[in-house]
Amino acid sequence: MKKNLLKIICLLIISFFTTSIFADIKVHFIDVGQADSILIQCDGENLLLDGGNKADSSLIFSYLKKYEITNLKYVINSHPHEDHVGGLSGALNFAKANQVFSSFSEYNSKAFNDFVKNTEKQNLQVEVLKAGRELSLGNAKIKVLGPIYYDDKMNNNSLVLHLVYDEISFLFTGDMEFDEERSLLDLDLIPQCTVLKVAHHGSENATSYRLLRSVLPQFAVISVGKNNPYNHPNESVLSKLEDAQTKVFRTDLNGDIIFSSDGKELEILSER
């Protein structure tokens, strides 16, 4: 990554935005509290990665409606935990999906079963997305980095995705913890990125110094709820990010966060 060529424009505004300077790619980190949901728009194509909890279905529905998104090229569930899969039913009830993916095709929970049922209503199946596969979203390229092994601990089965759009890149980590992180780093599978989605809401069980040395992120986003009972984000993770000189954005503090880019310059807009 040619960091010296990357001009960063940070605009934090109180009144939420309707227009950004750059329109080629937008990555929305949606404030779904203690959960994850990310909307990616690129060159007229859309991807939804996770959808928060079941209670967030109406929020996701409204968010897509606000941005007039009626077609999703990809709906991706990083792993079957409810705080990632629950609200995807709202998305599938509003927008037509082309393909639907998860790290599993079956999982015994009501939230995941509802996700499968709503996928089937569109005459689609939940496909297992495996390491090594590459997807395109407009001119952006997305590579599936992991998981490369399946683990008894569901968080370590999170899909890890690396998105590249010209000189800008994002690393999406789901709830990846140290074991999955280590398995990818040992095989040198994690590249540098401009923006890191911090794994597992900033849990103390994720985001090692080794990862940060590999990724060298300029920005990090933590999707986390206010006054959550898990002490997320953990102070140790915030300290590591500070040591890495990474600028941190948090949905509990900043609300919805949108990164917009033309592939060279980056604009960051937040709700608060």
Predicted feature locations:
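Hydrophobic core
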Residues: 12-18
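Non-globular, low-confidence helical/coil segments that flank catalytic cores
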Residues: 2-8, 20-272
